[in-house]
């Protein structure tokens, strides 16, 4: 049974535990520690990137893991779980839900419809569609996506990057879709999180504001008198 409800309880806060290679906290051991801290703080789920991080987090928590695999494959713009091999790798590492780029941009292997179908039939995992527009969300659900996230709003060439969370897109998705909608992207304050739930989000995903001390420090340092 791949049902989403047995993996996530809504409403909830999902903490994204990810670090780029240039971050001092890069490494599975650090992401596992972040996940444990998030669980202790009351998080209802973890979003994590790559089989090594997913496996390390799986070893220290029973929280649902929303897994993805970022792979930059030239010349393609799609990098969030771009093909079935990536999806299989994070599923085998212990991810409960598989997140993928659900934009219409070219992909290196399977088309979006085939990818979602293979994840369902071969891996028996629910799919979270990361989108940047309402149209992408509608199409993803038509193709079988089990939930939709605003992850890519402002991160595609054809969408405007808002200063904070894209509440307009969130509102549109909530009103149009019958599947759970996850709000993600540029959340920094409790007020923004509360606003997302007021608009009908089933979950809010917060990453940098919780798990990136370097960026948090940079934001605070901007207020130091020069």
Task: Name every feature range the model reports, one short phrase each.
Residues 18-20, 72-73, 93-106, 147-160, ...:
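Glycine-rich phosphate-binding active-site loops on the catalytic face of alpha/beta enzymes
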Residues 24-28, 47-66, 77-83, 102-119, ...:
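Active-site-adjacent beta->alpha loops and helix N-cap segments on the catalytic face
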Residues 11-17, 46, 65-69, 98-100, ...:
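Hydrophobic faces of well-ordered beta-strands that scaffold small-molecule active sites
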Residues 1-92, 125-127, 135-143, 223-225:
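Conserved N-terminal beta1-alpha1 strand-loop-helix module at the mouth
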Residues 2-25, 29-32, 165-226:
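C-terminal alpha-helical cap/extension of soluble enzyme domains
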Residues 42, 61-65, 93-97, 121-124, ...:
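Glycine-enriched alpha-helix->loop->beta-strand junction motifs that scaffold or abut catalytic
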Residues 40, 120, 124-147, 199-225:
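Amphipathic, soluble alpha/beta structural segments
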Residues 11-16, 33-34, 64-67, 94-97, ...:
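A short alpha-helix capping/helix-coil boundary motif
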